């Protein structure tokens, strides 16, 4: 009988131990700060084909977004509703440099136009999604 209780206690400890507090997919995300753009449209970005590493940064209290699309700097307005995990971008502007590799730049800027929401993708990642829930951009903490 004592053996049964010991086994039950071990099983319970293992079960409770698996309920860790690490971030899981779908949890609330604080967008504030700078992020690396690691995927666009579900495809990994090859940074050898960009002049600079693509990034996005957010200051949600100021409704501000900034970063780099791979060549040009990005600035604009980002309206974030953290409770609903929705986001909209307005007045996105870029510098006007011409770089050898511009393919990701165009894809990133087009993706920003269709972003409506965001969600945790686990492991320090966040996905910016369109109205259908498709990941348009995947961001990784810096």
Give the ranges of each region predicted by the language model.
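Bacterial Sec-dependent N-terminal signal peptides
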Residues: 1-30
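Lipid interaction determinants
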Residues: 19-142
């Amino acid at each position: 009988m004592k053996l049964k209780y010991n086994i039950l206690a071990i099983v319970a400890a293992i079960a409770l131990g698996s309920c860790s507090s690490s971030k899981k997919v779908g949890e609330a995300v604080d967008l504030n700060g700078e992020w690396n753009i690691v995927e666009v449209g579900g495809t990994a970005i090859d940074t050898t084909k960009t002049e600079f590493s693509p990034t996005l940064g957010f200051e949600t209290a100021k409704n501000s977004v900034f970063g780099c699309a791979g060549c040009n700097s990005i600035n604009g307005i980002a309206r974030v509703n953290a409770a609903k995990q929705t986001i909209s971008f307005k007045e996105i502007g870029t510098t006007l440099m011409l770089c050898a590799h511009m393919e990701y730049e165009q894809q990133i800027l087009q993706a920003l136009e269709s972003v409506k929401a965001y969600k945790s993708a686990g492991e320090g990642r966040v996905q910016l999604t369109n109205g259908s829930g498709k990941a348009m951009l995947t961001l990784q903490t810096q």
